[in-house]
Amino acid sequence: MEKTITTTELAGMLQAGNPVTLLDVRRKEDYEKSPAGIADTPWHDPSAVAEWIHTLPKQDEVVLYCVRGGSVSQSVQKQLADAGFKARYVEGGLEAYQKAAPNS
């Protein structure tokens, strides 16, 4: 499975109603500065994956994002994949998604 998903692919999944668990894993300080995310996605602390990983459904694909699709998303994606989840992160992160789909 690919590690990344494009903003176009994600928008298509959301519009089609595909089963996906979307996670906002921005650093706490980034989230607190600007809490608006993609489709009212719940925020999960990227520094505390062990505290919330057990709450995720294994049957759904997990798509996560940080601000720019960098080290935060990549680190969390790896932890989820290593635990057996189908996980990808948004290429370019929240910034890219908001540019591609500004009304989301």
State the predicted function of each range.
Residues 1-20, 28-63, 68-104:
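Rhodanese-like catalytic fold shared by cysteine-dependent sulfurtransferases
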